[in-house]
């Protein structure tokens, strides 16, 4: 059973309720990625690291028992990847020519989800911040490689 257009539409609405505010005042596509991560950091901070990604939490709990739910979760994650990939595609001239923006987008989402999970587990932003700092360093290195400048 495939996801209906209505389900895909609802997944887009959820994405846009987080993305639109995050990207409102940021025009640089790579900085949009980090603005999204900053929104999640703020949500964690404001909740003393109790808030997490509700879709990520649901995905951990409902991995196999319900294929229809799993499919909706996949639509949601695919939507996140697609939006981040769009940012990275817009910055293609600042990334190495062989950069796979789909894989990079998956890496960004995994960094966010893993950082959120660790922050909630340890009730501290330390792991989340370390993940984002490492991701920032990686993007800086990619951009330096693309331009031939020193890292």
Task: Mark where each language-model region is.
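Hydrophobic alpha-helical segments that form the core
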Residues: 56, 98-118, 134-138
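All-alpha amphipathic helical-bundle segments outside canonical DNA-binding/catalytic cores
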Residues: 31, 71-75, 92-107, 123-126, ...
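Amphipathic alpha-helical segments used for helix-helix packing
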Residues: 32, 47-68
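Hydrophobic alpha-helical connector segments
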Residues: 19-51, 101-108
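An amphipathic alpha-helix adjacent to DNA-recognition modules
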Residues: 1-24, 34, 74, 81
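Amphipathic C-terminal alpha-helical segment
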Residues: 43-46, 109-126, 138-147
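Hydrophobic alpha-helical bundle segments that form small-molecule/ligand-binding pockets
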Residues: 25-26, 65-67, 78-104, 139-151
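Structural signal for well-ordered, non-membrane alpha-helices
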Residues: 12-16, 20, 41, 81-85, ...
């Amino acid at each position: 059973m495939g996801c209906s257009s209505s389900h895909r539409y609802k997944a887009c609405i959820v994405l846009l309720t987080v993305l639109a505010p995050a990207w409102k005042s940021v025009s640089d596509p790579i900085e949009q990625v980090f603005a999204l991560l900053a929104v999640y950091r703020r949500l964690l901070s404001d909740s003393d690291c109790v808030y997490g990604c509700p879709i990520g939490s649901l995905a951990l709990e409902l991995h196999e028992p319900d294929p229809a739910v799993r499919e909706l979760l996949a639509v949601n994650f695919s939507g996140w990847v697609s939006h981040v990939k769009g940012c990275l595609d817009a910055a293609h001239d600042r990334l190495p020519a062989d950069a796979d923006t789909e894989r990079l987008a998956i890496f960004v989402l995994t960094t966010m989800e893993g950082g959120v999970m660790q922050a909630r587990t340890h009730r501290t932003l330390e792991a989340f911040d370390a993940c984002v700092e490492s991701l920032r360093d990686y993007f800086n290195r990619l951009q330096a490689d693309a331009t031939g400048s020193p890292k």
